[in-house]
Amino acid sequence: MRIVSGRLADRTRKYWPILMAGYCLELITIPALALVGENGWIAACVLLVIQKAGKAIKKPATDTVVSFAASQEGAGKAFGLQELLDQFGAVLGPLLLYVIMLFKTEGSTFERYSFCFLALAVPAIITLTLLIVTRCNFPNPELFEPDAKEYVPLKADKRFVLYIIGICLFAFGFLDYSLVAMHVSRTASDIISAEVLPLLYSAAMLVDAVAALLFGYLYDRWGMKVLVVSAIVSAPFSFLVFLGKSSLTLIAGVVMWGIGMGAQESILKAAVTDMTPKSSRATGFGIFSLAFGVAWFLGSWTLGALYDVNLTLMASVSAACQLLAIPFYILSSNLMNKSRGTA
């Protein structure tokens, strides 16, 4: 769906309508869960599918609009700032629900959760209002980046193909935090209590946000070399988290995980901006999202299966895949530098 949405955005240049449609679907469906009955799991599933569809529709257009604005300050800074704000919202949302649950003690658990979903309509309305205001002030975001009067199809040039292979290897080896949380809760209760797990996740998200901004700034100065650094730094996290025997190694592993997550949310998108022509960039983001998502899904399934077989093997595969991405980053970077030199 992201490729279709991206190609549609490129062909029509209707970035705002596509972006707004996706946001509306995504933001309306979550508060609508408050209207689902106690046994209405089918309706809840339908709403969640619609929410995911909305996210898929909006993402290529959103990233493309950010990339246009990035031409003024730098792609790394722009996507790093986007991730910082995204993580701010990711922390603020659960905090809001925690406060609501803390003070709303009457009613059943189901009624309290329904009220929480309904309360999420407030930030949803604020978000849509801000989008409308931004749309009114900047109706043609493509003008931030002057170039390409006509649509130029995205070509599968060698540097982009090598880059996609690299990010697929990285995504395949990058474990989801849910597996980290499950492992800690099952086997590391003597190291860290279950009550601390949410705080550990919050710390990881904080590292994610800071790393995204930092690596974004570094990307604008040094280019894709920073991707190599981030891969080297984050690759050992699986050994520390799954094979470590102390709280110190666990915390260090989670910090490394946060660095890897922050890097992928800023540098990886910034590189797509620099590799794709303006007129077909949304298609490029769609291909990037599809490749990354499929690789992460397959990697999560494979590493989850290996978790029950051998932790050392699982950690080794995770680290190896992330490190195997480095040669592809370097090759892609060299080709990019050559193309700039001959441009």
Indicate residue ranges for each PLM-predicted region.
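Cytoplasmic membrane-interface "Motif A"-like loop-to-helix N-cap segments
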Residues: 11-23, 220-232
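Juxtamembrane intracellular "pre-TM" segments in multi-pass secondary transporters
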Residues: 136-166
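Hydrophobic core of transmembrane alpha-helices in multi-pass small-molecule transporters
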Residues: 29, 40-58, 168, 249-263
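Helix-to-loop junctions at the C-terminal end of transmembrane segments
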Residues: 1-14, 101, 211-223, 307
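Symmetry-related core transmembrane helices of the 12-TM Major Facilitator Superfamily/SLC fold
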Residues: 114-132, 314-331
